[in-house]
Design a protein with these regions (language model features):
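Walker A/P-loop
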Residues: 5-28
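Inter-Walker segment of RecA-like/P-loop motor cores
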Residues: 55-105
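Non-catalytic, compositionally simple segments
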Residues: 118-235
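Conserved Walker A/P-loop ATP-binding site and its immediately adjacent core
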Residues: 40-59
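Post-Walker A helix-loop "phosphate-sensing" segment adjacent to the P-loop in P-loop NTPases
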Residues: 31-39
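Walker B catalytic acidic pair
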Residues: 110-111
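Catalytic P-loop NTPase motifs of RecA-like helicase/translocase cores
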Residues: 18, 99, 115-116, 145-146
Length: 235
């Protein structure tokens, strides 16, 4: 319908040092300020309040650095509020039972690979049912195993017409020992080949593969990436 959001979910995958926290903060603030909703609720979710606080602190710094945003926003220790609309942006630690009472306009779930299950994400999606143009953003680095909620989401999201996948990382066909692959998995200018080479020499390869190639380690019997995920991410 006209004026309705094409995507209700987004899955973003970036390697370590890729700027995930900054991206999450910028997206959350963009939604709160550029799509004003009366008493809109905007949350950052992670496994702990400390982890979610990393993203929130980035958002708070962005607001304080901009004169216009600073003038229209009340900045508290763990909450940003726009008095004119009553909208709030805050940290929400992982607690699926408590989250049942929220009705968010937008949610950023940070480092989803650490989540034990999908209960928090499901609670947030359930709370958005009556929200027009709600958006749930899941952002993460690859997990240590090819199982769990992030792996399952990576399998289902590319097939969902209401979900958008943007996953930057190596594929199973890529040689993880090749610096050219490292560069493609880390296109950010602030990440150098020297930095990656130091990590390659220091870390066990499965750890390097996960953190710096953003690829789930190909161990065990479940070796293949979900069919079509890379094309969906690249497209």
């Amino acid at each position: 319908a006209r004026g309705r959001r094409v995507y209700r979910e987004a899955l973003i995958g970036l390697a370590r040092w890729g700027g995930k926290s900054q991206v999450s903060a910028a997206l959350g603030l963009s939604l709160m300020y550029c799509e004003p909703t009366y008493e809109g609720e905007y949350y950052v979710v992670a496994t702990t309040k400390k982890q979610a606080g990393i993203v929130f602190d980035k958002a708070k710094r962005m607001v304080l650095a901009d004169p216009l945003l600073r003038a229209t926003t009340k900045v508290y220790r763990a909450v940003l509020e726009i008095p004119e609309t009553g909208a709030i942006f805050r940290v929400l630690p992982w607690d699926a039972d408590t989250a049942q009472g929220f009705h968010p306009q937008a949610v950023v779930i940070d480092e989803y690979h650490v989540h034990r299950d999908a209960s928090m994400r499901e609670a947030m999606l359930s709370g958005m049912v009556g929200t027009e143009n709600g958006l749930l953003i899941t952002i993460s680095t690859a997990g240590p195993e090819r199982k769990g909620p992030l792996w399952e989401l990576l399998k289902t999201a590319p097939k969902d017409p209401r979900a958008h996948v943007f996953w930057v990382g190596a594929t199973d066909d890529d040689d993880g020992h090749d610096p050219k692959v490292w560069r493609r998995a880390n296109p950010m200018r602030w990440i150098t080949i020297k930095m990656l080479r130091d990590q390659y020499r220091t870390l066990p390869f499965p750890v390097f593969e996960r953190l710096h190639l953003n690829r789930f380690p190909s161990t065990g019997t479940n070796r293949a990436y979900p069919a079509g995920w890379w094309h969906a991410a690249a497209g």
